[in-house]
């Protein structure tokens, strides 16, 4: 048998050759967790010690989850999708990504879910970028005071509760009082600005439907399309059939889509319809995650849920492009109780509230705005000069009218001044009525309110106020340049006021003299205008019996 000999040089050369040719591979560290329990849209996962808060996780069937509770031994995960295929023992992988949504102009005219995926069967959406859902709100130095008007097209709001671009204005009221109608009318009213092509005037709108019936969201979309407003609107839909996690995330998705445009120097209007259902969804998620409950079983951070969302609405400084995002959150009350937990939270966060009263709605006063409770804390600085001039005493006049109306129920004989308040107040209330999907340009609103507050409608029967208003505005449109002047200057000077006075006096002479259109017909009560000086009881024209 041959003797085995080992040459040290050969060994050295072999090792050198191997070392020279060795190429180390890219070692990958993969964390894999396992599902311990899964039910009701919540999964508990163990084995992922390095996961981040709000990180996306991927289950075996491809469903995504959102890491929420980071406990010592396991993670509480919100399942973003169908959870019926997720079972105990399945693997869960990290993605290393924070939850974000695609954004861009391609989203205009589309309906998407809270993850930014289209659900309107119109094909894929080519996104310009992605934006994290949990994005920090602009800081104090990045903001500018609200000074540009956001016109709703509704006389009761634009005159007494004005909204500015960058403001947060709460719409609050019982169910079926017209909250969504106000939001939709506001979107429709932006059509003229969009058609102008002026970037400084155009407003991109985002409607976030949370917990609504799918048929309701579909009806909103159809309404916007019928009125030509869908082309500048994105709808983020999370109907009642969606899991609680989707309803919780939907407002943040809509806000992220709007913030992309805001930081691009554009103006955005976001409707959150409604935040009370988002709070209920967050309560359900928190209880399933076994977080300790607080008042009304809501978690302790439910205030932060809404504050960090609404604080994103802002008017940015000129250095950041001077864009703005206006928020119109909607909250539903029960039995007009605005002192409940969620309503008081959102009232304290926002810059004002529009309170809708069910009694007014049932009395056919629509929009059913309760002027006494409603307020806009910062919108007054954004109100156009002409509107501020004519509506200065409107709120006080209506408050005095309501007080006098309550007093008149028990008083058999009133002096002339009291009758004057009742006469004018009834006509102002009628003047503030407005049909749905028929927003008014601001110059038309100024003329209507000017006529009412200056007593030019006192001799018009209440039931004919609406017809008088529409025909007078049509008369001005075709036979006068007053509306054009008001639209261009936004100032009601003495010359314009004199021209308006001459026009309405002339119009009333012809209007009262019309044959079939005579304002006082069979069965109508005839009233006479009462000036402030008519204090003698004899000067009051009695009603015809």
From Swiss-Prot:
It is an enzyme of class 7 (translocase). Its EC number is 7.1.2.2. It is a peripheral membrane protein. Keywords: ATP synthesis, ATP-binding, Cell membrane, CF(1), Hydrogen ion transport, Ion transport, Membrane, Nucleotide-binding, Translocase, Transport. GO terms for molecular function: ADP binding; ATP binding; proton-transporting ATP synthase activity, rotational mechanism. It comes from the Bacteria. The record marks 374 as: Required for activity. Its main location: membrane. GO terms for cellular component: plasma membrane; proton-transporting ATP synthase complex. It is found in: Cell membrane. Belongs to the ATPase alpha/beta chains family. This is ATP synthase subunit alpha. It comes from Paenarthrobacter aurescens (strain TC1). The lineage of its organism: Bacteria, Bacillati, Actinomycetota, Actinomycetes, Micrococcales.
